[in-house]
Amino acid sequence: MRKIEEQMNMAIRSRKNWSGSNTTVRCFKENGVTTEVNVLLHGNCIAWFDTASNDFNISSAGWETVTTKSRLNAILEEFAPDRRVFQKNWQ
């Protein structure tokens, strides 16, 4: 896992806003409590976490690049270790 992805995961876990290079973690609060955490790559939301239910969703946001898959796999490694994103035959 890349250093930037380790920092991204740390920000998600600690529910802190963070930005590094092309990746941003944005936390949304309601009444002082973090309710949602979004991960953006080049300004496109690729993951969002509901902190109340501990559910999360991922998306390539239409950009099926090596970097997008790397960020998504770093998130999955941390929060759903039995899952992976991969591409076969460009699909």
Predicted regions and their residues:
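Terminal leader/tail segments of proteins
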Residues: 1-91
